[in-house]
Amino acid sequence: MKTKEKIVQESLSLFNENTFEQSTTNLIAKKSEVLEGSLWYHFNSKQDLVSVHTELFLDSFRKKRIYTEKNDPKELILGLLSIYEVLWDYRYLVRDSFEQFSNENPKLCEKIVDINHEIDEWAKEAIIHAKNVGVLIIQDEDIESVVEISLIIGRHWLDYSMKKYPSKSNLYLRKKGINLLIKTLYPYLSNESREMVDSIYESD
């Protein structure tokens, strides 16, 4: 792995685990096994790393969201759950406060706000589409609540779970989060979709 790629990867891991604010450049360099001068050679600031992470997030998010627009029930369901995986991988972007960027780097601050708005809009569109193709049997008045609960899990389970289960692995916490999302959607799944979800997770 190239030095720049390693710095991007290790900084993402640190920001997720420790928050952006508490991850110092010295810590990033140490975790990346490079001198701090090498870090500065590739990136002028931690904000530059956030900018790279936002691009990587959007690339993954937009590739996965295509599947949530499919009419095939299995592709749609797996697509919905795969978005959660992307949110987990870049969780600090939807968890941390970046108010300090509003003056220091307004363009980056606006980009993070736009990302969060895009996630909100996608969640509602995905639930409505799932209803329209028969994956979900849900009343219009319940859509907003299901969307909001799903977003709360997607955004805040990530941080809460690590505090509640500090000794558990990331894999365990990811799976538990997915199970919470399934439980949120399960009462609204069509019979066919329930059988599909049951078979997928029985095989796992």
How does the language model describe each region?
Residues 88-109, 124-128:
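Amphipathic alpha-helical segments used for helix-helix packing
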Residues 159, 163-204:
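C-terminal peripheral helix-coil segments that are non-catalytic and often amphipathic
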Residues 55-61:
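Short, basic, alpha-helical segments at the C-terminal edge of helix-turn-helix-like DNA-binding modules
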Residues 6, 14-52:
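Helix-turn-helix
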Residues 65-93, 110:
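Hydrophobic alpha-helical connector segments
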Residues 3-10, 146:
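N-terminal positioning helix adjacent to the helix-turn-helix/winged-helix DNA-binding module
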Residues 65-68, 94-101, 130, 134, ...:
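Secondary-structure edge/capping motif, primarily at the C-terminal ends of alpha-helices
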Residues 106-133, 144-159, 176-187:
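Amphipathic alpha-helical packing segments from all-alpha helical-bundle domains
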